[in-house]
């Protein structure tokens, strides 16, 4: 029986690793990284992955070391490395065939592409399901968001009369510290803490409206969090009134990832949905990072109890390619188009991975595993209040803050160099945990033990 089917009762680790006195990178990794530096300027992790040595939650390196991975390739890993289900002969044959024959999707339709479309349509956000629901695939998360915005602009244009529409400007409303991608439309609804990504592009498309994101701070009182939420909603209401008829759409993440693992109250999203409906503004959710099941549902939007369905949801990462869900089809054909429309080999792999996820019931247990993880993190915060606070999240996507940015950077360094534990930062002072769905209870317990050891060294 595969380990992931054992109800999460043990860890994929053979044993708790001893202190890693040999710092990364190892000599083989260092040589390979040095060679890459001749070809491209890249900000690399200090190791080179050996895919054959990876297993479950563990990365293997070309130097023969093992790293406990809680970054999940920037939240793009759906199931554990080298799962036995990914070596079934019939699947491997389909995968190789797709890899050897890259086709433009879906224009040159294949059975493999159709199966992907059938799968993503079947698992669509429940709140959006209707006979007219349409899906479209592109190559990345940024392209998914970009095309979602094009879809909303198209709806906005048609609502204003199509060809006879006035020249009145159009805008998007978005939130502080949002990250939606690195294409031009997406960058103009993005506010990164590192200005390098946006400095030459932000504002290139003028007129967009930025408002605060009411991130919950679990270290503060419920009333203070509710007050923050009310203030933001009042601002949104005022802006939609002030710029009536000009706002094409609202773009929002259920959890702000790069912006600091920021989580809002469900009531915020519910009232945002009501405001969008009241002002006849289209609402689009960026689930590039959250979709796939780690929050306890395939789509986190289904956990928000929205009074009105969003017009669109964009996703990618764990889905292999970029996907746009549209509540209703576009009237203007050809607005969304791409040569490749996503990679066929990624489509084939995702279909197989989703079969594994459903067979092993991994989404259903993500909530209970998330409760175990959150409880353990709260315990760390109670034991180390001078270091850790504001534990928050949904399902397995949990995070916490350090009391200053220097501590966060130090924790990441100590974790990797001394415990072979890979963590991922978020915002200025936070850590976001992004495990794959094959994570077991033992993996969670091991993470908490390693974090305890790291915090004692700070």
Q: What residue spans do the PLM features occupy?
A:
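Conserved N-terminal phosphate-binding loop of PLP-dependent enzymes in the Aspartate aminotransferase
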Residues: 2-458
């Amino acid at each position: 029986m595969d380990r992931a089917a054992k109800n999460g009762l043990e860890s994929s680790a053979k044993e708790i690793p001893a202190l890693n006195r040999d710092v990364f990178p190892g000599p083989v990794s260092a040589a390979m990284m040095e060679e890459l530096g001749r070809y491209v300027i890249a900000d690399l992790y200090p190791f080179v992955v050996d895919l054959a040595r990876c297993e479950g939650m563990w990365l293997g390196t070309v130097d023969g070391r093992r790293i406990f991975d809680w970054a999940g390739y920037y939240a793009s890993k759906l199931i554990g490395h080298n799962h036995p289900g990914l070596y079934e002969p019939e699947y491997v044959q389909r995968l190789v065939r797709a890899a050897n024959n890259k086709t433009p999707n879906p224009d040159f339709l294949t059975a493999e592409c159709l199966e992907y479309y059938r799968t993503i349509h079947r698992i669509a956000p429940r709140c959006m399901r209707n006979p007219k629901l349409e899906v479209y695939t592109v190559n990345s998360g940024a392209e998914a968001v970009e095309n979602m915005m094009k879809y909303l602009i198209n709806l906005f244009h048609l609502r204003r009369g199509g060809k006879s529409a006035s020249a009145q400007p159009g805008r998007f409303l978005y939130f502080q510290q949002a990250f939606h991608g690195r294409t031009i439309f997406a960058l103009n609804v993005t506010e990164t803490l590192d200005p390098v990504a946006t400095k030459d592009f932000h504002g290139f498309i003028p007129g967009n409206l930025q408002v605060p994101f009411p991130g919950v701070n679990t270290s503060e009182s419920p009333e203070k969090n509710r007050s923050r939420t009310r203030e933001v909603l009042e601002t949104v209401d005022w802006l939609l009134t002030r710029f009536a008829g000009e706002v094409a759409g609202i773009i929002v993440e259920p959890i702000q990832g790069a912006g600091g693992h920021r989580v809002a109250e469900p009531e915020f999203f519910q009232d945002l949905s009501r405001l969008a409906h009241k002002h006849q503004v289209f609402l689009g959710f960026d689930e590039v990072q959250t979709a796939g099941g780690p929050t306890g549902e395939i789509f986190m939007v289904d956990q928000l109890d929205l009074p009105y369905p969003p017009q669109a949801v964009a996703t990618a990462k764990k889905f292999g390619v970029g996907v746009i869900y549209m509540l209703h089809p576009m009237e203007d054909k050809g607005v969304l188009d791409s040569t490749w429309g996503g990679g066929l080999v990624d489509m084939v792999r995702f279909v197989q991975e989703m079969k594994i996820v459903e067979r092993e019931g991994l989404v259903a247990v993500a909530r209970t595993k998330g409760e175990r993880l959150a409880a353990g993190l709260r315990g760390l915060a109670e034991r180390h209040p001078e270091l850790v606070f504001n534990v928050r999240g949904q399902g397995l996507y949990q995070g916490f803050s350090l009391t200053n940015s220097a501590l966060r950077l130090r924790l990441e360094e100590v974790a990797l160099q001394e415990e072979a534990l890979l963590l991922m930062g978020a915002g200025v002072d936070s850590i976001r945990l992004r495990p794959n769905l094959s994570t077991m209870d033992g993996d969670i317990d091991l993470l908490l033990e390693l974090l305890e050891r790291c915090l004692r060294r700070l």
